[in-house]
Structures are given as C-alpha cells and as structure tokens.
C-alpha cells in the first residue's frame, strides 16, 4: 500500500465519521423539535376552541363555562417581576465582584463560589421549605403573600444569575480592561464603562432565561400558600395570589373532562409566555451585540 492509498483511506474514513456525526446531530435536533412541536400540537388540538378572549379575562371558577386565567396570569407577573427586581441586581453585582474585585484563590472566595454552585442545583421545593420556615413564618413572618413568593423565587434564581453573569464577564477580552488601565482609568471606571457593557448580551440572555424558569415553578409556591382559585388580582406584595402553573395543575386534577381542556389552554398560554421571554432574550442579545460593535 502506497502513501497515497493510505492517505485516501484515512480521508475516506474521516469523511464517513464526519457524515455519521452530522447525521446523529441532525437526528437529535429533529427528535427534540419533534417532541416540542408534538406537545404544542397536542395542547392546541385540545384547547383550540377555548383560545378566546374569555379564557384570559375570566377569573378561575368551578364552572367550566366561565373559568379563565386572569388572576393566575397577573399573579405570575407580580411574583416573577418582584423576584427579578430582587435577584438580578444582586446577582449581577455579585458576579462582578467575584470576577473583578475578589481576591483570586483566597478561602472566602472559594467558599462563596462553592456554595453558589451548590445552590444552583438545589431542588425548588427545598427553597419553598426555607421560605416557609423563615419568610412566610418564622423571623420575617410575611405570611402567604406575593412578597414571600417573590423572595423565594429570587433566592432560587439568584445562583443561576450569578453563574451566567460570571461567564459573560469572563468572556470579555482582558485587553479591554488592560487598555483602559494603561490610559489612566481606575479599575472601577474600566469595569463600568467597558467590561460591564460588553458583558450585557450574555448577562441579559441568562437573566431572562432564569426568570423564565421562575415563571414555570409551582412546587415552592405550594408550600407558601398559593391559592388555587383566586377571583381577584393581586394589588401589591402583601396580597394573596395564585400563579399560572398552579391553576393549570388544579384544573388538570379535576375529575371533569372540561377542565382538562381548560388546563391545556392554560399550558399553551404558559408556553407562549415562556417563548416570548426567550424571544426577548434573543432580540436583546442581538441588539446589544450590534450596539457594542458600533
């Protein structure tokens, strides 16, 4: 066998492996998309005759003809918005401190990083138990209110926001800050004017995805007194509330078949909200990326 034959054989083997790998990736993507669209089609097929204005403007009810999701939608908006207001600034500033100002390798930083990584993997129901013991009852005693639920969801998404923000800040080329420091800028000026704006695309995308996770949570809120049927919209952090995932669960667990279709409609509404948040994250990332390039 000549060297040319050996080279051709190796080239053919590589092409086969490359084609096999590409085929496997394509099949995996198609399988994932097929599953997602299959779920969406199933929900649409069950609820297409219910997707009217009434399903959004009506309050939850034991009468399937007048049942809707107005208070769960407003409750989810209240809870998730307050959680984002609390978690996002704290998470981004913590990530900024750990990446730019904390001492590398000291014991405090290592302990803090380890705990943040561990908290990111804690089940949501554990955060609910902590909130029940220390926020709804216990030292704070806020009761079963929107504020209690928002604080628990903020604790739940905070580690994710910190980790994503750190990765985004770490991805900024070091030459940006080094150039600013060489021109006489202070470390804070370099971070505020160069590092932080350059990390906005990744930070914003990760933060919105973390908020999307909070939007779909129900387990911790079950422990915090979220009601199943609320016929009023929350008016502030001290109001009682319900959320969209919990209302969907309540309708789906009813023995009457009509409520199962209503639960499918609620699931489709939740998916639309989550897809909208993901779309906002993509558009915001693209906009900030183009702005930084200019």
PLM regions and their residue ranges:
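Generic hydrophobic transmembrane alpha-helix motif, especially the helices
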Residues: 117-157
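C-terminal transmembrane helix and the adjacent membrane-cytosol boundary/short C-terminal tail
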Residues: 98, 166, 170, 174, ...
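Transmembrane alpha-helices
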Residues: 84, 164, 187-225
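Transmembrane-helix boundary motif in ABC transporter permease subunits
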Residues: 83-116, 129-132, 137, 282-290
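Interhelical loop and adjacent transmembrane-helix boundary motif
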Residues: 60-63, 67, 221-271
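Membrane-embedded alpha-helices of multi-pass transport/permease systems
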Residues: 34-37, 41, 89-96, 126-129, ...
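Periplasmic/extracellular loop-to-transmembrane helix junction in inner-membrane transport proteins
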Residues: 3-24, 42-83, 105-106, 250-261
